[in-house]
Amino acid sequence: MYLDLTEKQVLILEFIKSQIILKGYPPAVREICTAVGLRSTSTVHSHLNKLEKLGYIRKDPTKPRAIEVLERSKVNDVSGANQEIIELPLVGQITAGEPILAQQNIEEYIPFPASLVKGSNNFVLRVKGESMINAGILDEDYVVVDKKNTALNSQIVVALINGESATVKRFFKEGNLIRLQPENDFMEPIMLNDSEVEIVGIVTGVFRVIK
């Protein structure tokens, strides 16, 4: 529906809308960087300038976080009253042989704008550790996961190792081996036999609570 926008620009616009509906105010540029997987704030500023030029947003250069979503984007508005909100389960633990969404595993339900959620079988997982910091996924962040049991090379997955520990890593299949690659320059990849790894789902989004 955003025919004049790139994929990144759509992600940025939808993220801004979602933060306004969830928090009541727009995100900082650094938060946008993290949310859409960009490392450079100048790249985000470039996308924001394009969104403003096309009439999707209005910025106030004299104020931080001063981004207003304009009427043009409200064809797909997540801040409007008609926007569908869905509740995704926050899963406290993942255990082999037990359904992920078993009631005893669910800590709470978190509301999300439906337009930001890919797939139809999603859950939220709290990240522990710093193995994915280069991908913008930090300790105590929350990831949105599309429940699947297969993955393509380079996708970020939630995987169960030897039926015991769940981990978030980038997935690569190399012959009969699986490489679970951290996004941290100080950590080594995990190499496992195919039979030792169970794909739980694909990470499709990340968000954090600013304390």
From Swiss-Prot:
One of its GO terms (molecular function) is DNA binding. The active site is at S131 (for autocatalytic cleavage activity), K169 (for autocatalytic cleavage activity). InterPro entries: ArsR-like_HTH (IPR011991), LexA (IPR006200), LexA-like (IPR039418), LexA/Signal_pep-like_sf (IPR036286), LexA_DNA-bd_dom (IPR006199), LexA_repressor (IPR050077), Peptidase_S24_LexA (IPR006197), Peptidase_S24_S26A/B/C (IPR015927). Residues 29-49 bind DNA. Belongs to the peptidase S24 family. Homodimer. NCBIfam families: lexA. GO terms for biological process: DNA repair; DNA replication; negative regulation of DNA-templated transcription; proteolysis; SOS response. Represses a number of genes involved in the response to DNA damage (SOS response), including recA and lexA. In the presence of single-stranded DNA, RecA interacts with LexA causing an autocatalytic cleavage which disrupts the DNA-binding part of LexA, leading to derepression of the SOS regulon and eventually DNA repair. PANTHER family: LEXA REPRESSOR, LEXA REPRESSOR-RELATED. It comes from the Bacteria. Keywords: Autocatalytic cleavage, DNA damage, DNA repair, DNA replication, DNA-binding, Hydrolase, Repressor, SOS response, Transcription, Transcription regulation. The record marks A96, G97 as: Cleavage. This is LexA repressor. It catalyses: Hydrolysis of Ala-|-Gly bond in repressor LexA. It comes from Clostridioides difficile (strain 630) (Peptoclostridium difficile). Its EC number is 3.4.21.88.
